[in-house]
């Protein structure tokens, strides 16, 4: 969902999620948008750069990566549950599991880099 607003005389677009509005960390919506769009890491990072026009610090970026991993696991588990009820999602389930697995590794690498820089 997109909201068109004016800020300081300029037209801006905001990404919103009416289903979960006000009930969670807004960074979950960024992560879910990436998952639903089947973005790769380069596309995820480009979206984060576009969304955070003032810049995004590493802590928030890693948090979004964590949400991508957690939400990928959530949706892959949901697909498995539905499969047991006779509903097949094909490749979608595997893609969601890959988000969980791949972003877990990305998070581990990012945290390792922070530790090496003394930024724990």
Predicted regions mapped to residue ranges:
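Active-site acidic catalytic loop and adjacent metal/ATP-binding pocket
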Residues: 1-30
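Short amphipathic alpha-helical segments and their helix-coil junctions
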Residues: 44-63, 100-109
């Amino acid at each position: 969902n997109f909201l068109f607003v004016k800020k300081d005389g300029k037209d801006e677009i905001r990404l919103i999620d009416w289903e979960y509005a006000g009930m969670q960390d807004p960074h979950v919506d960024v992560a879910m948008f990436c998952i639903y769009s089947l973005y790769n890491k380069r596309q995820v990072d480009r979206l984060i750069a576009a969304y955070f026009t003032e810049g995004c610090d590493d802590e928030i970026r890693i948090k979004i990566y964590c949400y991508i991993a957690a939400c990928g696991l959530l949706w892959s588990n949901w697909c498995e549950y539905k499969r047991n009820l006779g509903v097949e999602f094909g490749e979608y389930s595997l893609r969601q599991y890959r988000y969980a697995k791949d972003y877990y590794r990305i998070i581990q690498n990012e945290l390792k880099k922070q530790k090496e820089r003394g930024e724990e």
